[in-house]
């Protein structure tokens, strides 16, 4: 829990280039974690912004020519300055444009964390996926039958890229190729509002600013799931969204320790 306390104390600046659909919620979840968001995306300023930030997040949702240019500039700046960065592979399972771009970004910017659902992770690894738009396809969902083979694929992707891989879903799998963790927190409501995956990427960006990449990623993923569970009895999706941010802001270490469901593989 030292990472949480460090973030709250230091309030690191987090540069997050995301989509207009979820940008407000992403900024607020970063604030709730104790960090400071900046959402700059103009190609002429992003290098300067990234260079003074403590971490970078890039999100492939709702991409544009300018945003693609900006993310690559920021990613290279982060890599050159040893600033931790995470890429969210939104939609690479259904869009060749995004898939080709993600491969280029990973090759040239070497992100510390690659995050996506199982359809997106399979696509970036080069395996045919059954993505349903930006959502995971039914055939790609992790089951008891495909659990081991999916874990091995995630580990290989991590070793080949040098990145921590975070495969999110009903069960979350996070690996750096050597250590692999399975997190079973979360609730259905998290999939019933738009932007929770984007918010998680902002949270990962916040916690990896501590430079403890694997632990920061694990903490972010577990916290999102736990806060979802704490919020799931809300009246509806609107109040759930608000309670999710409230719980992220107020959750104690004791509750995290009590609620977390994590196993090593």
Curated annotation (Swiss-Prot):
One of its GO terms (biological process) is thiamine diphosphate biosynthetic process. CDD domains: THZ_kinase. Its EC number is 2.7.1.50. Pathway: Cofactor biosynthesis; thiamine diphosphate biosynthesis; 4-methyl-5-(2-phosphoethyl)-thiazole from 5-(2-hydroxyethyl)-4-methylthiazole: step 1/1. The keyword DNA-binding does not apply. Substrate binds at residues 39, 195. ATP binds at residues 115, 168. Keywords: ATP-binding, Kinase, Magnesium, Metal-binding, Nucleotide-binding, Thiamine biosynthesis, Transferase. Belongs to the Thz kinase family. Catalyzes the phosphorylation of the hydroxyl group of 4-methyl-5-beta-hydroxyethylthiazole (THZ). This is Hydroxyethylthiazole kinase 2. The lineage of its organism: Bacteria, Bacillati, Bacillota, Clostridia, Eubacteriales.
């Amino acid at each position: 829990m030292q990472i949480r306390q460090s973030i709250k104390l230091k309030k690191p600046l987090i540069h997050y280039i995301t989509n207009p659909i979820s940008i407000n919620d992403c900024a607020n979840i970063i604030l709730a974690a104790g960090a400071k968001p900046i959402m700059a995306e103009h190609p002429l300023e992003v290098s300067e912004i990234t260079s003074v930030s403590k971490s970078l997040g890039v999100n492939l949702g709702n991409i544009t020519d300018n945003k693609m240019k900006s993310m690559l500039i920021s990613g290279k700046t982060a890599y050159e300055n040893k600033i931790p960065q995470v890429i969210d592979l939104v939609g690479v399972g259904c869009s060749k444009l995004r898939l080709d771009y993600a491969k280029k970004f990973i090759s040239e910017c070497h992100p510390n964390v690659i995050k996506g659902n199982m359809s997106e992770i399979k696509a970036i690894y080069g395996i045919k996926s059954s993505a349903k738009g930006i959502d995971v396809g039914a055939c790609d969902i992790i089951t008891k039958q495909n659990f081991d083979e999916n874990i091995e694929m995630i580990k290989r992707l991590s070793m080949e890229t040098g990145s921590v891989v975070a495969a999110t879903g009903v069960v979350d799998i996070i690996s750096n190729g050597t250590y692999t963790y399975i997190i079973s927190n979360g609730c259905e409501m998290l999939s019933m509002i738009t932007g929770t995956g984007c918010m998680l990427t902002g949270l990962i960006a916040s916690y990896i600013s501590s430079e403890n990449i694997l632990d920061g990623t694990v903490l972010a993923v577990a916290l999102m799931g736990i806060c979802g569970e704490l919020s799931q009895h809300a009246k509806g999706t609107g109040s759930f969204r608000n309670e999710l941010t409230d719980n992220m802001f107020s959750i104690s270490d004791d509750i995290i320790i009590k609620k977390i469901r994590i196993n090593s593989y």
